[in-house]
């Protein structure tokens, strides 16, 4: 071995060998159990950041560990390569998005290979390649064929800066999640996926995912937002129409003091036409048009409303109720109408107080005298209680009244029980170029016609003009003009492209069969590899990507293309990489470049630090001293191997070659097998990579000390050193591969079997017991491992120094914990 650890020579050498030998290709036909390890694939922004390094290092440890445990591992990588940054770069630099994207992919691929990640590069996918988006279009058509895609005019979230529509999930606090521009409302014809058809099963099947973090499942539950309530009709006064209201609190309906319509509700125009209220209401409606959903419904937003001049009739009490419009009611949610019950809803209480509307109590806390039913409230009462001011339902518990009132609505025909979901259908249309074209055609004779599957892919054209605020595909006549596949007449192509989440909602399926030219994947291949056994990515994808991927998987199962109905069996959401207490980002100027760290210390050091510095699910604080420490540790491993190299090359390590072991050799073997046991558990069961690395470091220290013994059992030393290398291999693959080779092994360390724990080696003949006097440590004593409590107490009483420590005091009792401590209680 060379005297110095030269990572700059070692790492490229092994990276090339691994690729040339195709060491990490998954086996197509194998008797081994399968394991599918996957990190969320990256957007090719141009350079890896430390968040990438952490994500991919975590999955690589898992993949390498599973290979060594006898699994046939699928560990692929690809590029989520459509999206706005490429298009914005095209506008700014006059560079075609494809050119910008492929250049970035080449650079990031080089960086990934320099990290030594054990990818099966034969399965690499790129979503902007026609061979890939052909099948994104194919999947769109399958969903369309099965009635899960439709087009409608809708008030959509519009980002003026990005000049495109945003899904509800892409609006954060009223702003575009990408550029932070305030989002407005705009009416456009858009394509939608009917994810709401799967709302209930998406909710129910979260119970099938014990390997997912509770936080992520809760976020999805809240986003789906299932509620059980009733829809009831309020007749309009002097009018033939009705207002349908959805409520989860039909038990409070006798307390309704107003009904609110969304400003966009079609009834509003009928109610105000020709009245004295028309102008003011129209002005209010116009003002609402410029506001997006979040801005209108946020708890921070002041509730605004206006009386329409019209009234409706409460179907239970027969009372006349004023009709208002307000900013917080959205036409897209429920029925676009809500009933206002100020006494029992905090928002309604606030609204009624502002506009001096009546507040009528209809539920009292249990035990409250009925005489207090009309006492003015200081705040809304939202708990359960007894019904008052509610006609025939007075005296009932409100939960009983809820059922009876629903029964009445259904019996009398003015309402019914109803389950509602917060989840909306997925709007996938984007007015941008760099996305998969929507494979639909508009014909004046035939209407909307899907592109035949044998004509896919619908390719992105090159003859487009990039201008801020304009959809580039509308500038390409060669793209727009086409022939109707049904009648052969002139027709126009759809010029919107798909949301990039369309491509990332099925990429994990393409990895199972990436070179299939006829189908997105063969059922046999997908059924073999799916589910993904371990998925790793940021919690910021909890709703969008993870929900859409679950939806796609369930639908494709229903279409007959898959056996599984959940894509990811286990999910790990890794923490952020921080510097100075804040997430690394260019805008904060606190970025550490992976390339700089790798060039200075090597990829193994970068990997080791990022895995050692914190548990994977926690945020990691970057620390230069910690990086230096990991580099020094790898140098210690190198020097340790160099010191043992010559003698170990000629020494076997068979089970029968240890011979008679002295105490030092037994202790060394015990620590070796304790470390094997601990690392196996930490990596395999808990992903506690930091404690696994710590255990390996302790074993290295122990082997250094063992080397100083007067007599070294070389078989024991070899077992310890080889165990160190194998246990360290998933974390630091290059240095361990090099040392393994230098020790005379011809096979790759990464193809070695993971070491087994020798239970006999774990048996201790002696243990160290702590001796305390009134809880204060006085001494540590060696005793037989199997000593009983009585024997331990007797041995302590015979200690010469016990009299010295207890002089002038009375021994009250001696508490023993065999194998751990003895506490002598005195006064």
UniProtKB/Swiss-Prot annotation:
Q: Name one GO molecular function term.
A: leucine-tRNA ligase activity
UniProt keyword Transcription, yes or no: no
- Provide the species name: Desulfitobacterium hafniense (strain Y51)
What's the superkingdom here? Bacteria
Q: Which InterPro entries match?
A: aa-tRNA-synth_I_CS, aa-tRNA-synth_Ia, Leu-tRNA-ligase, Leu_tRNA-synth_edit, M/V/L/I-tRNA-synth_anticd-bd, Methionyl/Leucyl_tRNA_Synth, Rossmann-like_a/b/a_fold, tRNAsynth_Ia_anticodon-bd
**Motif extent ('HIGH' region):** 42-52
Enzyme superclass (EC): ligase
The question of whether Aminoacyl-tRNA synthetase is a record keyword is answered with yes
The record's subcellular locations are:
Cytoplasm
What are the EC numbers? 6.1.1.4
Q: Which GO terms describe its cellular component?
A: cytosol
**Catalyzes what?**
tRNA(Leu) + L-leucine + ATP = L-leucyl-tRNA(Leu) + AMP + diphosphate
User: What are the entry keywords?
Assistant: Aminoacyl-tRNA synthetase, ATP-binding, Cytoplasm, Ligase, Nucleotide-binding, Protein biosynthesis
Task: Give start-end ranges for motif 'KMSKS' region.
Answer: 583-587
Q: Which GO terms describe its biological process?
A: leucyl-tRNA aminoacylation
Chief subcellular site?
A: cytoplasm
Q: Where does ATP bind?
A: 586
Q: What is the protein name given in its UniProt record?
A: Leucine--tRNA ligase
NCBIfam families referenced in this protein's UniProt entry, alphabetically: leuS_bact
Q: What is stated as this protein's family in its record? A: Belongs to the class-I aminoacyl-tRNA synthetase family.
Q: List the disulfide bonds.
A: none
């Amino acid at each position: 071995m060379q005297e110095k650890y030269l990572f700059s020579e070692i790492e490229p050498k092994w990276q090339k060998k691994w690729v040339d030998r195709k060491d990490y290709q998954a086996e197509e036909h194998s008797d081994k159990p399968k394991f599918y390890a996957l990190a969320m694939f990256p957007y090719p922004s141009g350079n890896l950041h430390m968040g990438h390094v952490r994500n991919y290092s975590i999955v690589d440890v898992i993949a390498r560990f599973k290979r060594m445990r006898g699994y046939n591992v699928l560990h692929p990588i690809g590029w989520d390569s459509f999206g706005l940054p490429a298009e914005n770069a095209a506008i700014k630099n006059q560079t075609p998005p494809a050119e910008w994207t492929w250049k970035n992919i080449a650079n990031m691929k080089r960086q990934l290979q320099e990290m030594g990640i054990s990818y099966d590069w034969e399965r690499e996918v790129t979503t902007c390649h026609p061979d890939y988006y052909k099948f994104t279009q194919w999947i769109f058509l399958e969903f369309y064929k099965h009635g899960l895609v439709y087009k409608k005019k809708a008030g959509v979230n519009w980002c003026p800066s990005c000049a495109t529509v945003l899904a509800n999930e892409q609006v954060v606090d009223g702003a575009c999640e990408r550029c932070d521009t305030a989002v407005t409302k705009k009416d456009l014809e858009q394509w939608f996926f009917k994810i709401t058809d799967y709302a209930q099963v998406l909710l129910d099947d979260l119970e099938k995912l014990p390997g997912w973090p509770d936080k992520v499942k809760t976020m999805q539950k809240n986003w789906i937002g299932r509620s059980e309530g009733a829809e009831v009709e309020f007749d309009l006064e002097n009018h033939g129409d009705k207002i349908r209201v959805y409520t989860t609190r039909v038990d409070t309906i006798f307390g309704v003091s107003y009904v609110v319509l969304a400003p966009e509700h079609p009834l509003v125009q009928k109610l105000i036409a020709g009245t004295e209220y028309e102008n003011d209401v129209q002005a209010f409606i116009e003002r609402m048009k410029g506001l997006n959903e979040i801005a209108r419904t946020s708890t921070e937003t002041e509730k605004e409303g206006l009386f329409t001049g019209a009234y409706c009739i409460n179907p239970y009490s027969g009372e006349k109720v004023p009709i208002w419009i307000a900013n917080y009611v959205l036409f897209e949610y429920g029925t676009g109408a809500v009933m206002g019950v100020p006494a029992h809803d905090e928002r309604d209480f606030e609204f009624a107080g502002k506009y001096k509307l009546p507040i009528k109590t209809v539920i009292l806390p249990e035990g409250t005298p009925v005489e207090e039913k009309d006492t003015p409230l200081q705040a809304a009462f939202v708990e359960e209680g007894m019904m008052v001011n509610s006609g025939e339902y007075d005296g009932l518990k409100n939960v009983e009244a809820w059922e009876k009132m629903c029964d009445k609505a259904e019996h009398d025909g003015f309402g019914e029980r109803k389950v509602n979901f917060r989840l909306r259908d997925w709007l996938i249309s984007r007015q941008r170029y760099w996305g998969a074209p929507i494979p639909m055609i508009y014909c004046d004779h035939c209407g909307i016609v899907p592109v035949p599957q044998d004509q896919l892919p619908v390719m992105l054209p090159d003859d487009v003009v990039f201008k801020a605020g304009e959809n580039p595909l509308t500038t390409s006549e060669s793209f727009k003009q086409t022939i109707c596949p049904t009648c052969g007449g002139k027709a126009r192509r759809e010029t919107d492209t798909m949301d990039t989440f369309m491509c990332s909602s099925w990429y994990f399926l393409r990895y199972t069969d990436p070179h299939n030219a006829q189908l997105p994947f063969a059922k046999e291949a997908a059924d073999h590899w799916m589910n993904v056994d371990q998925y790793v990515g940021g919690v910021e994808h909890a709703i969008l990507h993870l929900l859409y991927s679950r939806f796609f998987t369930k639908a494709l199962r229903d279409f007959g293309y898959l056996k599984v109905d959940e894509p990811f069996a286990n999910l790990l959401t890794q923490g952020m990489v921080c510097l100075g207490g804040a997430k690394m980002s260019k805008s904060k100027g606190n970025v550490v470049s992976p390339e700089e760290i790798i060039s200075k210390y090597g990829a193994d050091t970068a990997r080791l630090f990022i895995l050692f510095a914190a548990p994977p699910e926690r945020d990691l604080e970057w620390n230069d001293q910690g990086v230096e420490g990991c580099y020094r540790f790898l140098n210690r491993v190198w020097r340790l191997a160099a010191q043992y190299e010559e003698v170990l090359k000629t020494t076997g390590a068979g089970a029968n070659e240890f011979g008679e072991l002295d105490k030092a050799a037994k202790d060394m073997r015990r620590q070796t097998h304790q470390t094997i046991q601990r690392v196996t558990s930490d990596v395999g069961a808990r992903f506690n990579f930091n404690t696994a690395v710590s255990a390996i470091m302790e074993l290295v220290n122990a082997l250094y000390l063992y080397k100083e013994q007067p007599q070294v059992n070389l078989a024991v030393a070899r077992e310890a050193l080889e165990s160190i290398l194998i246990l360290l291999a998933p974390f630091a693959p290059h240095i361990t591969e090099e040392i393994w080779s230098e020790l005379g092994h011809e096979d790759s360390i990464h193809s070695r079997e993971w070491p087994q724990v020798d239970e006999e080696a774990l048996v201790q003949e002696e243990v160290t017991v702590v001796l305390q006097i009134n809880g204060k440590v006085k001494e540590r004593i060696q005793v037989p491992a199997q000593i009983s409590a009585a024997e331990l107490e007797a041995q302590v009483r015979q200690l010469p120094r016990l009299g010295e420590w207890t002089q002038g005091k009375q021994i009250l009792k001696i508490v023993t914990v065999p194998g751990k401590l003895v506490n002598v209680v005195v006064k």
